């Protein structure tokens, strides 16, 4: 899960930029899904990523895409937290 705030751009502008990047994320090896998050009232945005393997996630964290997005000054105070999926419970609730 990654969270950040927007600095100097609106939600609309952010969405337009992300539309251009969505295909790059979709092409990432091992990415099962990415859910884009927004809370305009609190100026908090981010994403929930589901990976096939920890190796796929680590490859993303070392990629040009990750570092390029992270270097964008409009995305400030970025925080990333890693979690493991509890498979048995997630299956019950139709998780991926």
Label each PLM-derived region with a short phrase.
Residues 1-4, 35-63:
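Short, well-ordered beta-strand segments in beta-rich or mixed alpha/beta enzyme
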Residues 6, 37-41, 69-96:
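Glycine-rich beta-strand-turn "strand-cap" elements at beta-sheet edges
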Residues 8-10, 55, 86:
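Residues that cap or initiate secondary-structure elements
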Residues 2-5, 13-20, 47-52, 75, ...:
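A generic short-segment signal for beta-strand/edge and adjacent turn/coil regions
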Residues 12, 57-59, 90:
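Short acidic, gly/pro-rich beta-turn/loop elements at beta-sheet edges
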């Amino acid at each position: 899960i990654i969270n950040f705030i927007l600095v100097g751009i609106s939600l609309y502008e952010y969405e337009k930029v992300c539309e251009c990047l969505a295909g790059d994320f979709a092409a990432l090896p091992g990415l099962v899904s990415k859910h884009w998050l927004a809370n305009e009232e609190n100026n908090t945005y981010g994403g929930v990523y589901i990976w096939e393997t920890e190796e796929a996630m680590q490859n993303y964290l070392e990629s040009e895409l990750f570092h390029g997005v992270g270097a964008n000054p409009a995305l400030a105070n970025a925080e990333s937290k890693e979690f493991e999926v509890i498979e048995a419970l997630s299956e019950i609730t139709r998780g991926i």
